[in-house]
């Protein structure tokens, strides 16, 4: 392991000890924001410290095994060779783990997200598929212990949604869903197709980190235009009789957000403002990424909505992620929310890309 990496790890261990001490101080305990932030930092540092302790122990085991090779007892020498082999394997594995821990961390990984799904080409079938995607993400969220709430929805004429915007909140939501942005294509025979022909439709997905208040996304009240309108009811039930739905336009950028699913105008306005801040935060993130032109383009894609990232082929029961050439013949499981078999390879590919970038520096 390079000396620079060891020095970085040592500084993290010292910081872990410092944070541990701070968390027991009365002044920190009484300040909820500081206590929360330090608790998060501690939870990030804890696995690094544990891995480094294992690494240090493996180095000691290796040294002890080397010394045993000089023994005259043949049985002890054989035992030493086996222990040396195990120690070298452990060192190699732990060095890889520690390198990944040291990768630059996305500051938004812990954020909640706004998930936008829009029907694209394909008419009614695209709307139906957007509904299928929303169910898929809802089931995945449930499996992860996350919560999901609908912010705004425009239903399709024959089912599904022309557009649905939801908020997903829980632990590490953005870290797992950030690679879902892009165009999702479906190939299947629609229920209305009498000739049995396969149709191709598409939906676009956008995943945006929710802007935290501490991130300082300030919006000048003079820069926004707020309109109220009557929320549409579902199937004629609970139709809103008042103009409680909110549409906010951010005049400098032209960004428009709507919210109509909360019970009051006040709640709809708060949700719409939160979504607007997240859109402006995402725009800032996109701008920064474009400015970093010298940085290698991520193998898992730019997150551009127009970029086709995945195909769901129903006749073959196949899902293909085009960014990493991953093909799985488990479409039914994926649509039931078993997304880890796709998401984890994307995360690993992203980590490998970052490691390659670090080695080039």
UniProtKB/Swiss-Prot annotation:
Q: Which PROSITE patterns does the protein's record reference?
A: RF_PROK_I
Principal subcellular localisation of the protein: cytoplasm
Answer whether the UniProt record assigns the keyword Hydrolase to this protein. no
**Localization in the cell:** Cytoplasm
> Which GO molecular function terms does the record list?
translation release factor activity, codon specific
Q: Write out the PTM section of this UniProt entry.
A: Methylated by PrmC. Methylation increases the termination efficiency of RF1.
Keywords, ordered alphabetically: Cytoplasm, Methylation, Protein biosynthesis
Q: Where is this region: Disordered?
A: 287-313
Record's Pfam families? Answer: PCRF (PF03462), RF-1 (PF00472)
One GO cellular-component annotation of the UniProt record comes to: cytoplasm
Bias category Basic and acidic residues: which stretches? 287-297
SMART domains, alphabetically? PCRF
Q: Please give the residue positions where the record annotates the modification N5-methylglutamine.
A: 237
Q: Which family does it belong to?
A: Belongs to the prokaryotic/mitochondrial release factor family.
Explain the purpose of this protein.
Peptide chain release factor 1 directs the termination of translation in response to the peptide chain termination codons UAG and UAA.
* Name this polypeptide is given: Peptide chain release factor 1
